[in-house]
């Protein structure tokens, strides 16, 4: 714990290079005295920190489980999922621009998922000995080979609309 006290002009001590201490009252700066006080009490931060590691351990295990799940997938599955997630990001941007309701936290979550998957993909390439330049070349080829398709959420929305139309057609017939 620090305490700060302002010294009076008569007790101010100004330290210069050549001397250990010299007292001067001609300066307008009166000096600042900093004292360290040791208290016998246990600070509140110490008691809180002892209980806080439990949630962080849970978060770590959740992240580990997610990474284990990502690493268990093949590279092709990862690429397919990256395409799907990027399509979902596009749909979120579309909802945002149309001023529809959406969760803003989904942007960050999806971007992080894409980054994790691409990181695992790059880790595998490094393990196989693929250099950075060749990796970029392969990525360009992969991106050119992607067939545009609607994201899963849009597919589900289209299926729901088709089911509603079929139900309405059945009612009117």
Swiss-Prot record:
One of the GO biological process terms: translation
Region ranges (Disordered): 143-173
Phosphoserine modifications at: 172
GO terms, molecular function: structural constituent of ribosome
Pfam family, one: Ribosomal_L29
Subcellular location: Plastid, Chloroplast
Matches recorded under CDD domains: Ribosomal_L29_HIP
SUPFAM superfamilies in the record: Ribosomal protein L29 (L29p)
Protein name: Large ribosomal subunit protein uL29c
Organism of this sequence: Arabidopsis thaliana
Upper classification of the organism: Eukaryota, Viridiplantae, Streptophyta, Embryophyta, Tracheophyta
Gene: RPL29
């Amino acid at each position: 714990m620090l305490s700060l006290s302002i010294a009076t002009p008569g007790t101010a001590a100004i330290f210069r290079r050549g001397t250990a201490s010299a007292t001067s009252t001609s300066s307008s700066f009166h000096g600042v005295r900093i004292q360290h006080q040791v208290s016998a009490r246990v600070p509140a931060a110490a008691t809180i920190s002892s209980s806080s590691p439990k949630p962080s351990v849970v978060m770590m295990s959740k992240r580990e489980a997610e990474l284990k799940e990502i690493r268990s997938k093949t590279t092709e599955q990862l690429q397919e999922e990256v395409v799907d997630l990027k399509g979902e990001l596009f749909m979120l941007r579309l909802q945002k621009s149309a001023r529809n309701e959406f969760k803003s936290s989904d942007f960050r979550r999806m971007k992080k998922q894409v980054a994790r998957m691409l990181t695992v993909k790059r880790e595998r390439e490094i393990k196989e000995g693929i250099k950075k330049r060749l990796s970029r070349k392969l990525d360009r080829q992969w991106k050119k080979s992607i067939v545009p398709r609607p994201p899963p959420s849009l597919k589900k929305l289209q299926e729901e609309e088709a089911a509603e139309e079929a139900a309405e057609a059945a009612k009117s017939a």
